[in-house]
Amino acid sequence: MRISKPHLRITSIQCYVCLLLNTHFLTEAGIRVFILGCISAGIPKTEANWEDVRKDLQKIENLIQSLHMDATLYTESDVHPRCKVTAMNCFLLELEVISHESRDGDIEETVKNLILLANSSLSSNGNITESGCKVCEELEEKNITEFLESFKHIVQMFINPP
């Protein structure tokens, strides 16, 4: 599977370390560059991931309009901030239903990419356990339009945390 977002490509830090060890690492400036490089490599870039998730979600919405799907999906319409990871996992599971029922290659590819991006962003939050949140099957079933609107709202919660 190919991720279509260029900022998610992993750079090989080993090459930089080897280069620094063989040339400038013995100077004070080389040590500073090495330390700053190590620090910047550890900074998560989840904000960009959620923006890309939002863009893929918009693309899915546009593609679905041409298919006229009438599926109903478990939808969390009033997400509490302390349950946003649980709600996002439910949305991602339901998104697979859209992918399966659409039988459209563009939707399937975009859904796979969106799920990959969202999961990589969620993994940066660590293993968060949220108690008191509804499980997916307890959520109200709504049409695709309402599902996508609620999905966009929760993605926005990850982009701009309360």
Swiss-Prot record:
Gene3D superfamilies: Interleukin-15/Interleukin-21
Keyword Transmembrane: no
Signal peptide annotation: 1-29
UniProt entry tagged with the keyword GTP-binding: no
Disulfide bonds: 83-133, 90-136
Matching InterPro entries: 4_helix_cytokine-like_core (IPR009079), IL-15 (IPR020439), IL-15/IL-21_fam (IPR003443), IL-15_mml (IPR020466)
A GO molecular function held by the record: cytokine activity
Subcellular localization, as worded in the UniProt entry: Secreted
Residues making up the propeptide: 30-48
The family this protein is said to belong to: Belongs to the IL-15/IL-21 family.
PANTHER family, alphabetized: INTERLEUKIN-15, INTERLEUKIN-15-RELATED
Protein name: Interleukin-15
Organism: Marmota monax
